[in-house]
Regions:
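P-loop NTPase catalytic phosphate-binding loop
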Residues: 66-239, 246, 283
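Phosphate-binding and hydrolysis-coupling loops of NTP-dependent motor/remodeling domains
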Residues: 1-80, 225-284
């Protein structure tokens, strides 16, 4: 019988639902119902409930940056990371707690997606001169004209590294700060291209974070699983991460939740902060 249903409260009851309209067939009933809803909406002048928040199928950078919770994060001097799935709120990282960020994945497409996402956020928030990209894999050349320094494949990166080291040492000497963000799009290729020494990396990471220099290190999990002085140092000193893979498929960070995991899409990540992971939606 149409409109007949079971409703479970303390006990199961049989109920009969009635529509406020009639019609000769289902299509006519539906059409009449739509008209009735429209007239009720037009007549109602009182308060209405808020829309149920939903994570969109695809999140653009403009949509993300214009979310009220994203704007609030920026006003509070926080770096917005992504949108969590439960409350559909922006999750962000306070700059007062932001040292450096590791992006970890087992897929090249996911690494590229997360890197693009973070670069776009930085470009929305900061002057281009405050951003440097070391892009040894030449996957992000579309940003070359939008940042202060872009060092691509087969380009000399030593001069830029030396300049960063000098700025860090000068700022430490003068007890001053300078806000600057360095995105390394593939750590393995960058280490090969730059011949950076472990002590150089240590200086940039440890002294840099004291004067406002922030690195975003993007790497495949296989590189970080290797045993070199560079990888051992990174694993010991990087404790905030965007993990674009199942937590159970990596061994760098301990899982904070042991529930069943689904494979992540390229626009989904785990934000690992203070030993807890939160699943987030990022932009495409």
């Amino acid at each position: 019988i149409k409109g007949r249903a079971l409703m479970k409260r303390d006990e199961v009851d049989v109920i009969q639902l009635a529509l406020p309209v009639a019609g000769a067939n289902d299509a006519q009933v539906l059409n009449n119902l739509r008209q009735e809803v429209a007239s009720l909406q037009e007549a109602w002048t009182g308060q209405r409930p808020s829309a149920i928040p939903m994570v969109p199928e695809e999140l653009t950078i403009d949509e993300f940056m214009n979310l009220p919770t994203t704007k609030e994060a920026i006003e509070n001097h926080e770096l917005p990371i992504g949108v969590e799935f439960e409350e559909v709120q922006t999750v962000s990282l306070p700059f007062s707690k932001f040292k450096h960020l590791l992006v970890l994945s087992d897929k090249d497409t996911a690494m590229t997606a997360v890197t693009n996402h973070m670069i776009r956020i930085l470009l929305h928030m900061f002057n281009k001169e405050m951003i440097t990209i070391f892009d040894s894999i030449a996957e992000h050349s579309q940003f070359s004209d939008n940042v202060g320094n872009y060092i691509g494949y087969d380009m000399d990166c030593r001069s830029t590294l030396e300049s960063l080291k000098e700025r860090v040492l000068m700022a430490r000497k003068q007890r001053s700060t300078f806000e600057h963000f360095v995105v390394i799009t593939d750590v393995s290729q960058f280490v090969s291209q730059s011949n950076i020494e472990p002590n150089e990396l240590a200086l940039l990471i440890e002294e840099g974070q004291r004067v406002g220099l922030h690195f975003i290190f993007v790497t495949h999990k296989t590189y970080l699983a290797s045993y070199t002085d560079i990888t051992k140092y990174m694993k010991a000193h990087l404790d905030t991460a965007l993990i674009a893979m199942k937590m159970s498929d990596q061994s760098i960070f301990t899982r904070s939740s042991m529930g069943r995991e689904e494979p992540l899409l390229d626009d989904q990540i785990y934000f690992h902060y203070q030993n807890v992971q939160v699943k987030l939606k990022i932009t495409k």
